[in-house]
Amino acid sequence: FPEEIGEYSLSNLFATFGHAKLLSRTQHPHLHSNGIHTHPMTLLFNALVTHKRVLFVAYHAPAKVVVDHVLAACAFVGGCGAVLRGFVASAMPYATLVNIDALSHQRGFIVGTKHPRLAELGLWDVLCHCEAQSITVSPRLSPPRPLPPFLDTRHPARPSLRHTLRSMPECMLGD
């Protein structure tokens, strides 16, 4: 698969965050899809699929821990590279203070770090603390804009596929 990535462990990701503490003051409908009963992995999936800025931190563990979690998160949300694409391009398995400028201009990312300053700067929407086994949603995260109405009465409705097929000559439909 074009976005298949190397070494990672979905088992470690689920073991770390499968029973994580959710730390957030407010509920975000695009993240907390089941309200206060949202499973931590569902919140993480929702954050990744809606291109939030997700930061994995582990201050006292080896760098491999955050790298492994970032790569596993890419595989988790993208179906191991076979279903959804584009997550590998927005991933940075290990970031340092040198990367702050690039991260501050990026709309969504999946980043890992051991440096506490990156978490303190608040460049994240969702903070996944690998050692504390907690997921924190930023209080600065704004709610999503409302979706446009399903039926727009200003424009005439387009004919359905069934109507289009019925109006086509039989020779165009084939067997």
Locate predicted features:
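N-terminal uDENN/longin-like adaptor modules and analogous extended polar/low-complexity scaffolding regions
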Residues: 1-63
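Histidine (H) residue identity feature
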Residues: 19, 28-32, 37-39, 51, ...
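A general structural signal for short secondary-structure junctions and capping/turn motifs
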Residues: 45-47, 67, 99-103
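Beta-strand-rich binding-surface signature
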Residues: 53, 74, 107
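Residues within HEAT/ARM-like alpha-solenoid scaffolds
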Residues: 65-68, 72
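A eukaryote-biased sequence property
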Residues: 71, 83, 88-175
